[in-house]
């Protein structure tokens, strides 16, 4: 891993840490979050596995160690997010357990997910494919987003909603199938997005 990749990895870790700890950062905060916050610990190893793979070190000791820890934490916490998944900085896992995300999904920056969330692939029909999640999106407990749908920037998806159609920016969606019930978006749910980016 070269210096630019190490720097990019540090920025991802810092953004995730800042969001998980409500605006705190620094080495002692990072150590505390690693020990006490399962969502941050999981993302720490996912980011390391992804970056060491991207640097061409598929069979290096750091990559293999990161993959091993990532796999261990997948089972321990019930979070099935492959390290190959494209996830922007500031990813926040509010509660863990029963989280399943397809590896081809694209997730923007500052996205919140809750327990029981499924973001998956549709294998047939007009929405064959995987979702693209915009930045600043809140996904509530038990929500399902499936197929080639686009979730607009700043949207909020309610608990147990099933999203099978595109959502515009700042949409609030609820129900089965999900429908837009307001355009107030995720304001108040997605917080601490002002982390330093350099």
Q: What function would you assign to each model-found segment?
A:
Residues 1-77, 188-198:
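Terminal amphipathic alpha-helical/low-complexity segments used for targeting or macromolecular assembly
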Residues 36, 43-53, 114-115, 138-140, ...:
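Broad hydrophobic/π-residue packing in well-ordered secondary structure
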Residues 77, 82-83, 88-89, 94-103, ...:
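Left-handed beta-helix
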Residues 171, 176-193:
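Conserved beta-strand-loop-alpha-helix hinge in the C-terminal portion
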């Amino acid at each position: 891993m070269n210096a630019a990749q190490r720097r990019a990895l540090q920025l991802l870790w810092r953004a995730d840490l800042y969001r998980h700890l409500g605006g705190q950062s620094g080495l002692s905060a990072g150590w505390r979050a690693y020990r006490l916050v399962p969502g941050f610990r999981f993302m720490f190893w996912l980011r390391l596995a992804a970056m060491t793979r991207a640097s061409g070190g598929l069979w290096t000791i750091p990559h293999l160690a990161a993959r091993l820890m990532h796999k261990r934490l997948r089972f321990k916490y019930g979070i099935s997010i492959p390290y190959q998944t494209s996830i922007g900085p500031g990813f926040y896992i509010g509660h863990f357990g029963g989280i399943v995300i397809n590896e081809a999904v694209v997730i923007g920056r500052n996205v919140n997910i809750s327990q029981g969330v499924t973001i998956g692939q549709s294998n047939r029909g007009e929405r064959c494919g995987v979702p693209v999640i915009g930045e600043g999106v809140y996904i509530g407990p038990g929500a399902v987003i499936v197929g080639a749908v686009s979730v607009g920037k700043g949207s909020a998806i309610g608990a147990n909603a099933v999203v099978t159609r595109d959502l515009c920016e700042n949409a609030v969606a609820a129900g089965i199938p999900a429908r837009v019930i307001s355009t107030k978006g995720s304001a108040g749910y997605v917080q601490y997005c002002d982390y330093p980016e350099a």
